Amino acid sequence: MANLFNWLPLLSGRQADGIKAKVEIYTWQTCPFCIRAKLLLWWKGVKFIEYKIDGDDQARQAMAARAEGRRTVPQIFVNDQGIGGCDQLYGLDSRGQLDPLLATPPNPA
C-alpha cells in the first residue's frame, strides 16, 4: 500500500536531497502526534517506512521491545536507532540535529 504522503512532495516540489538515512515510524492512523511527526518528515522530503499498529497488540509489543520498553506512538527510528516520539523529533529539528542525522547513511548489514 502506498504511503499516504507520497504524493505531497510532488505537489510541493520537495525533494529528498541529501537524505540517506533509513527512517521508520510506528503509528496509529488517528494519532495526532503521529500525524504531526509524519508531516515534519514529509516537509523535509523524507521517505519513511510506516508500521501502522492500530489494535495489533503483537506489533505494539514488538515496537516496545525495539523502543526500549516505550509503548507510546509514534516511535521513530533513524538507521535502526530509536530517537523517541514526536516531541523528540521536533526537538532534534529545533536544535539543528535532525538534518545531519537524516544525511547519515545506514550501516551496511
From Swiss-Prot:
NCBIfam families: GRX_bact. One of its GO terms (molecular function) is glutathione disulfide oxidoreductase activity. This is Probable glutaredoxin slr1562. It comes from Synechocystis sp. (strain ATCC 27184 / PCC 6803 / Kazusa). Keywords: Disulfide bond, Electron transport, Redox-active center, Transport. InterPro entries: GLR_AS, Glutaredoxin, Glutaredoxin_subgr, GRX_bact, Thioredoxin-like_sf. Pfam families: Glutaredoxin (PF00462). Disulfide bonds join C31-C34. GO terms for cellular component: cytoplasm. PROSITE patterns: GLUTAREDOXIN_1, GLUTAREDOXIN_2. Belongs to the glutaredoxin family. Has a glutathione-disulfide oxidoreductase activity in the presence of NADPH and glutathione reductase. Reduces low molecular weight disulfides and proteins. Residues 11-109 form the Glutaredoxin domain. GO terms for biological process: cell redox homeostasis; cellular response to oxidative stress.
